[in-house]
């Protein structure tokens, strides 16, 4: 149907003097019986039969204006049900011109006519009719309700959309729409979704983000399954530097499985990293990389490894770091893999990956790679000291690592010199003992 029970405000104003009311009328027995048959046919989804019954009634010479108005109004309803709004409009205008209904019914009819103008894209006529209805409703003591204000706001937004962007005319229509959109949302017990949308669009048109936030918060509460409202609210919070609130909304979206795209899932994982919850970030990245919703790319596997490393889960960082390293064109990630094995004190694996990193090349700091290789070999034990020394000496060839590398060279050479001195001293002692033995034989 056309009509809404929120066309009028719930609390009616004290009535001004209305037009002279017509006596309450009823149909004659014969006309009423046929009229009921037409209604029953409509109820049985037989609109053509209903229309024929009504047409036959209109052929009667003894119809009173009230009966004629009711019959034509029901015919208009038949056309509206068939979505033939042009015809429905013609018939309702005929009823309105008869002026045979009660004043309240005439007022309702005027609103329906305004709605049908809009349904047939006759925006100017609909606007004019609605303004007349507003005036008549106020005069009769029936202040317009939320749905009427929402409709008028929508008309002004339509007019705004037909003007040049950023023009004075566009702004003027938004100004006209605002009080009506505000009344629709704030005066209704349960505002409709599109009323919120209209009011929100007006506030966002002027970048009035502070005012838009409570509206979006209400929309999220009223329509908890609408992803777009959460997304807009998170964006508004971020715009207003309310990053914690923005993150909270995105957490809710994730818990509701509203984040499905690569960028969305990556962003929430990065937010968990930013808020120092790396374990949660790693779980998201791991799950979504395996599902394919986060792309199988080097940087994403590296990010997963970083998350595990930040969570101090060294072993869990190794598989994604290997994947990322294998996809990489340089040796940088193999070097990081070697460092991860160093954290685990797995010196054998650490040495292998650092060597491979140096071999693959294109490192940001090759001198540091040689230094780490030296440390790893040194940790493997005394028999790897010479190869460690070789690595440290290679590291001294890089200016930024020279001082550190020389310290390591000095440490190892000192240890070796000390051992050599100890060896010589031990040999000398043995020789001395051998010489002394002649006196005891």
Language-model segments: what does each one mean?
Residues 41, 79, 117, 156, ...:
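Residue at a conserved register position within TPR or TPR-like alpha-solenoid repeats
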Residues 44, 82, 120, 159-160, ...:
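Structural motif corresponding to the intra-repeat A-B loop/turn of tetratricopeptide repeats
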Residues 20-26, 58-64, 96-102, 132-141, ...:
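Solenoid-like repeat scaffolds
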Residues 1-93, 100-108, 119, 128, ...:
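N-terminal leader/linker segments that initiate helical-solenoid repeat arrays
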Residues 173-179, 221-222, 238, 254-258, ...:
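TPR/TPR-like (Sel1-like) alpha-helical repeat modules
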Residues 298-312, 319-368:
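Alpha-helical adaptor scaffolds
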Residues 27-36, 65-72, 102-112, 141-152, ...:
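Generic helix N-cap/helix-start motif at coil->alpha-helix transitions
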